């Protein structure tokens, strides 16, 4: 007769180092994809780097897996407010810093003789970027105050849905 009262669960590691390494290479692929748009490369290299844009999709999937692993391992359900606060604290300070820097550049540009497309950087698009909702309502004429921040907007949407 066994004195075990239930199934034994192996402890989950808090950090998934191999997956962190994979995320690094996915992010590197995305960076190289963006740079290859500016380079003249042989067709084979351009084709390979063009496919690296798929790293964003895999990065999102992997990040979702890691977040689920970290936040759903205990018996108790995670505290939704603490989850959102932790995610906000992780992504928003750097986002705000870059956005304010971009605002400064747009403000200074005419003073130093750099011409900007009329109406390109406007208050509506700035507000959407500030509140991380710019990817929720994309428009063809939308100004990219911080182009890569579309992914933060998509992440924030996923966090709210989590």
Where do the PLM segments sit?
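Membrane-cytosol interface segments of multi-pass membrane proteins
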Residues: 1-162
């Amino acid at each position: 007769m066994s004195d075990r009262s239930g199934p034994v669960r192996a402890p989950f590691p808090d950090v998934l180092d191999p997956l962190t390494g994979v995320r690094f290479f996915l992010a590197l692929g995305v960076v190289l994809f963006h740079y290859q748009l500016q380079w003249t490369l042989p067709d084979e290299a351009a084709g390979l780097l063009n496919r690296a844009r798929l790293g964003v999709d895999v990065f999102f999937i992997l990040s979702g897996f890691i977040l689920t692993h970290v936040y759903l391992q205990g018996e108790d359900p995670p505290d939704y407010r603490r989850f959102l606060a932790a995610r906000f604290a992780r992504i928003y300070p750097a986002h705000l810093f870059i956005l304010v820097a971009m605002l400064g550049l747009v403000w200074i540009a005419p003073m130093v003789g750099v011409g900007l497309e009329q109406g390109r950087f406007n208050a509506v698009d700035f507000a959407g970027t500030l509140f991380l909702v710019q990817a929720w309502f994309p428009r063809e004429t939308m100004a990219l105050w911080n182009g890569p921040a579309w992914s933060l907007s998509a992440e924030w949407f996923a966090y709210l849905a989590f």
